[in-house]
Amino acid sequence: MKLLEKEAENIGCKVIHNADLKKYNTFRIGGKAAMLIELASLEACEKLIPLAEKENISYYIFGKGSNLIVDDNGINGVIFHISSDEIKLLDETRVYCAAGVPLSKLCMFALENGLSGLEFAYGIPGSVGGAVYMNAGAYGGEVKDVIESAEAIDTNGNSKRYSVDELEMSYRKSVFSGGKNVIVSAVFKLVKGERSEIKAKMDELMQKRRSKQPLEYPSAGSTFKRPEGSYASLLIEQCGLKGYSVGDAQVSEKHSGFVVNKGNASFDDLMKLICDVKKVIYDKTGYRLECEPEIISDREEYRR
């Protein structure tokens, strides 16, 4: 790990030892990582990820941490934190965006330039890289509707640009899901619109979020993927699990599709609650719920 640290410092990357991972995910749960390295450039990704592979160092990729559940036991390896923030117009309707840019910043950039198409994403608390990775969506819109291409590097440091068809996007999935390729940028194809209309739509959807979602508590957004033929929140309510708690982890009383941290929820609290909900739903309805956030843990049962 010393070699990786030295190389990171040589190319100007910030290195943090014993990084508190609570600060790097929206659930505010998790222990410490042996090392966290800020990847603020394509060069950093191209050099450090292959080196970690070569040195057989375990690592995880973090963006804004809005779709992660992190183990309190911490991580013995390295967290690569994508912090690149470049965003620019390529032409009148196409926007280039680095993977570390917050979705909210991309949405505001589109608004400032009179570009429509990303209104649905305003308020989603993730990064562009994370949004592409899982084909993030809300209120009838998805990343696949507005993305033109994405660039990623593989474990050898080779870069490839993927067309929208090559991204193989479907409900909360892309060609990158479950793999090790690291998204470094994306290009979005938007349409010209009236700024006042774009802002009105963004404000309308933000008001919906605030009225329906438990934004006052830490969470990872929707905790379960939508099962075919139904909705996770509906099944949870029908089975009487709204408000169900394990420690400070709770099925939100405001929106049953969200699990929230009421204060000092532990990783084990959260995982037990999720397992309990999945079991009750299956026993009572036959539906198998799938957890939407990714589990970040060195424990064998959670390793992917």
Where are these regions (language model features)?
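Conserved beta-strand segments that form the floor/walls of ligand-binding pockets within enzyme
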Residues: R28, Y96-A98, E119, G123, ...
